[in-house]
């Protein structure tokens, strides 16, 4: 555990990096700053065999830092990684993405497309993008910077972009056992879908957060085991890596007010 002060953003990056632990040589994709830093931290610590691109066309042997890098910065290019090779990994199941849905329901289905009736939405967002194919092809984890009942929605998502553990929504030929949702990292806790019948399950509570607060901010029942732990603080080594990867502290803008990671 770290003796240094750490922020909530840093706690979430360290917690998010655990999603890739033990993955081996798969393409790690973090969509958004916190997931990207989490994937980069994993590559530089617990999961050195991960593959990561520069978000353009090259595979890196070391993650690029975020923000301005200076004229003398030289990316650690390893080889070309164009779209054809990206999709070889996607369709072959050799990828693990962490994404940020706008809505998640009790099945683990996710939405980034629209809010309200899709025929007449209250708000139009990105569209389904790559969510349908990703959800049937490889492992996925979720990042939620603001855990509330609007995100963790009662019933089903307004638009199911990413399938989950709902047999009624599975494409022909797919089984629930083939769906692979790993971690759900929020500003309150870490969860997964390892409860009874793939119910969402609490894995750890961030320091100062209670299970009651998590349930209060989730519109469907959360499985709370007897052995829920406190989310581990980032280690000194992890904090050093995070601060090297994000020298301009862009992470502080990703979480509202970015409070201390320990809120006791």
Task: Locate each region found by the language model.
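N-terminal active-site beta-alpha-beta segment that forms phosphate/nucleotide-binding
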Residues: 1-76
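Charged/polar, solvent-exposed surface patches and flexible loops
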Residues: 18, 40, 89, 216, ...
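Flexible, glycine/charged-enriched surface loops at secondary-structure junctions
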Residues: 11, 24-28, 223-233
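General structural feature for long, well-ordered alpha-helical segments within catalytic domains
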Residues: 8-12, 16, 30, 34-37, ...
């Amino acid at each position: 555990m770290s003796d240094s002060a750490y922020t909530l953003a840093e706690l979430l990056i360290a917690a998010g990096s655990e999603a890739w632990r033990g993955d081996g040589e798969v393409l790690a994709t973090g969509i958004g700053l916190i997931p990207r830093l989490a994937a980069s931290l994993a590559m530089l610590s617990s999961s050195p065999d991960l593959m990561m691109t520069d978000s353009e066309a090259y595979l890196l042997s070391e993650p690029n830092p975020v923000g301005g890098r200076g004229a003398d910065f030289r990316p650690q290019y390893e080889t070309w990684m164009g779209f054809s090779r990206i999709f070889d990994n996607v369709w072959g199941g050799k990828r693990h993405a962490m994404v940020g849905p706008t809505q998640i329901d009790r099945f683990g289905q996710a939405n980034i497309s629209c809010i309200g009736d899709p025929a007449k939405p209250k708000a139009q967002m990105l569209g389904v993008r790559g969510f349908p194919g990703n959800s049937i092809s490889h492992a996925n984890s979720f990042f939620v910077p603001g855990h509330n009942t609007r995100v963790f929605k009662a019933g089903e998502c307004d638009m199911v972009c990413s399938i989950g553990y709902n047999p009624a929504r599975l494409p022909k030929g797919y089984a629930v056992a083939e769906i692979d949702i790993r971690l759900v990292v929020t500003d309150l806790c870490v969860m997964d879908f390892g409860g009874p019948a793939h119910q969402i399950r609490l894995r750890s509570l961030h320091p100062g957060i209670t299970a009651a607060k998590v349930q209060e901010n989730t519109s469907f029942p959360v499985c709370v085991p007897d052995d829920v732990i406190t989310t581990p603080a980032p280690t000194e080594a992890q904090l050093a890596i995070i601060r090297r990867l994000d020298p301009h502290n862009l992470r502080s803008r990703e979480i509202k007010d970015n409070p201390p990671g320990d809120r006791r």
